[in-house]
Amino acid sequence: MKSLNDVNKGNDVKNQPVEEMNTKPEKIDFSKVKVELLFEEFVDFDTFSKSDFRAVKVKDCVAVPKSKKLLQFTLDDGTGTDRTILSGIHAYYEPEQIIGKTCIAITNLPPRKMMGIDSCGMLISAVHKEGEEEKLHLLMVDDHIPAGAKLY
């Protein structure tokens, strides 16, 4: 799997000469990381299997006007029709950092209107705290995975 260190804000490698780029993965001190407790309630397999997780390719990503948090994604979900998903991750990513990436989405959620735009699904992210600072990492996978590939 490719390193995703270059997609987070503050890790801009686009303008660095190759010689200056650090090819070793960033070391993370996990002793300072806090994660939410696991759910104590179990979900049966039939309920879980109703969620349709798919690989999606980010064709375009723009900031939603008049919103500080929302990004609007135009996604290839393998159906031949663009899918729009809005996500409140602008504090963690700039739109241009995500274009061309392969992400994971739940595609069978009912449309939800946000800022007047229908969001048709949800992108999957990992969230944790380092000290008091919340961190979010959009789940991205190998670009060799085709749009529409189902996750089990």
Where are each of the predicted segments found?
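Phosphate-backbone binding interfaces of nucleic-acid-interacting proteins
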Residues: 1-152
